[in-house]
């Protein structure tokens, strides 16, 4: 009982450090967006990187993911969820980008016109 009250009576350094790091990451993202001459895509990748770092920081510092007895299971489940979300998003972007021009035809004919040319002689 005395150990539990000693744990809760100390100053929340972990929360203060997490808060300061969150502010620093936000200001870094703002600096990259406003004050650098990088391309838009480079800025986006850097800002998304800062966002993922900040999300992990908030989960670890404020959500107390590793402090329970099954903390490693919670971290593993969260990482698996992030992996699934990243695979779905990047896979969707890859499919959209790779097959964007699949239906486009330079000759002006609608898609599927060349495949159905054997039926063109059956006009009524």
From Swiss-Prot:
The membrane-topology field of this record reads:
Multi-pass membrane protein
Listed transmembrane segments: 16-36, 44-64, 78-98
Per its record, the protein catalyses:
2 a quinol + O2 = 2 a quinone + 2 H2O
Catalytic activity, EC: 1.10.3.-
Alphabetized InterPro entries for the sequence: Cyt_c_oxidase_su4_prok (IPR005171), Cytochrome_c_oxidase_bac_sub4 (IPR050968), QoxD (IPR014250)
Q: Which domain of life is it from?
A: Bacteria
GO terms (molecular function) for this protein are: cytochrome bo3 ubiquinol oxidase activity; oxidoreductase activity, acting on diphenols and related substances as donors, oxygen as acceptor; proton transmembrane transporter activity
Q: Which GO terms describe its cellular component?
A: cytochrome o ubiquinol oxidase complex; plasma membrane
Keyword DNA damage belongs to the record: no
> Which keywords, in A-to-Z order, does the entry hold?
Cell membrane, Membrane, Oxidoreductase, Transmembrane, Transmembrane helix
Q: What does this protein do?
A: Catalyzes quinol oxidation with the concomitant reduction of oxygen to water. Major component for energy conversion during vegetative growth.
Record-stated family: Belongs to the cytochrome c oxidase bacterial subunit 4 family.
Q: What is this protein called?
A: Quinol oxidase subunit 4
Name of the coding gene: qoxD
